[in-house]
């Protein structure tokens, strides 16, 4: 395992990614890790680093992404534009020959789960929308306690009105922004999806995963929902049960054993 190598994808101090390569010389499957924190500047890429290191140690090329956040130059559309730019930068990385870009997996927790689901649905964005026209196909997404129905999250004022802060207002005032940013509105994505949620999560309710998964399955996407004991932050513990479940799912896909669709835990 080598790295992480820090690569800027834009001029802002928060526009960078960290690439960690697995041992070996051949192309490796790529997993992009998007951290959470309700899109706010208080939390950063340090939340993604342990998961990226674990993935690289298990044979994936891991990419931890930092992006502009609310309170530090982010919000709509800068935050989603950064995620799109980081993904689109992958073919131009110095070690791009070590990356199998035929199908990229995105993993995200909380607001990072929103960004991962949004990245998977970028292909459905209209021309000219922030993030439209992806260069790299996202073929799988792991959504860990994701904020996946932004309108519902806004109505429930999750994260002390974090969605409103991210999008600059509520669904009535910012209807077009919600239409372009809300993962549940960007279906089907064509990506295979795993939603993981803690049964005791009092930060992002499990209903966020359940509603998104039901809509994705109805649209024809392959989706699996798994619930685990515990709360919100346990999902990003690389030694925890929830992450072991994610690793197993990723390994099944890598070995050609994916393709399940179930909405049962």
Question: What is the role of each PLM region?
Answer:
Residues 12, 152-185:
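Mobile cap/lid helix-loop segments that gate and shape the active-site cleft of serine hydrolases
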Residues 202-211:
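Conserved alpha/beta-hydrolase "acid-adjacent" motif
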Residues 23-54:
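Short, surface-exposed "cap/lid" segments of acyl-processing enzymes
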Residues 1-25:
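N-terminal cap/lid segment of alpha/beta-hydrolase-fold proteins
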Residues 88-156:
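Primarily recognizes the serine-hydrolase "nucleophile elbow" in alpha/beta-hydrolase
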Residues 20, 210-265:
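C-terminal catalytic histidine-bearing segment of alpha/beta-hydrolase fold enzymes
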Residues 195-197, 201:
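Short beta-strand/loop motif that positions the catalytic acidic residue
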Residues 42-52, 63-103:
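Catalytic nucleophile-loop/oxyanion-hole region of alpha/beta-hydrolase
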């Amino acid at each position: 395992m080598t790295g992480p190598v820090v690569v800027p994808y834009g001029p802002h101090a928060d526009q960078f990614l960290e690439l960690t390569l697995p041992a070996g010389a051949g192309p490796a499957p790529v997993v992009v890790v998007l951290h959470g924190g309700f899109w706010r500047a208080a939390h950063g890429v340090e939340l993604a680093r342990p998961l990226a290191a674990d993935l690289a140690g298990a044979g994936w090329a891991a990419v931890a992404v930092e992006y502009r956040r609310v309170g530090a130059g982010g919000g709509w559309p800068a935050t989603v534009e950064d995620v799109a730019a980081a993904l689109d930068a992958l073919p131009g990385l110095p070690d791009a020959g070590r990356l199998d870009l035929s199908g990229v997996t995105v993993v995200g927790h909380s607001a990072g789960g929103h960004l991962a689901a949004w990245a998977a649905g970028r292909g459905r964005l209209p021309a000219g929308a922030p993030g439209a026209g992806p260069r790299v196909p996202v073929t799988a997404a792991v959504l860990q306690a994701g904020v996946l129905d932004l309108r519902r999250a806004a109505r429930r004022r999750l994260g002390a009105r974090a969605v409103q802060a991210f999008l600059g207002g509520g669904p009535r005032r910012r209807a077009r922004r919600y239409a372009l940013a809300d993962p549940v509105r960007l279906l089907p994505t064509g990506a295979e999806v795993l939603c993981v949620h803690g049964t005791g999560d009092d930060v992002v309710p499990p209903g966020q995963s359940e509603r998104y998964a039901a809509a994705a399955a109805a649209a024809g996407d392959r989706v699996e929902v798994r619930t685990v004991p515990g709360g919100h932050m346990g999902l990003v513990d690389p030694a925890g049960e929830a992450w072991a479940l994610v690793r197993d799912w990723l390994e099944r896909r890598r070995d050609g054993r994916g393709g399940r669709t179930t909405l049962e835990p």
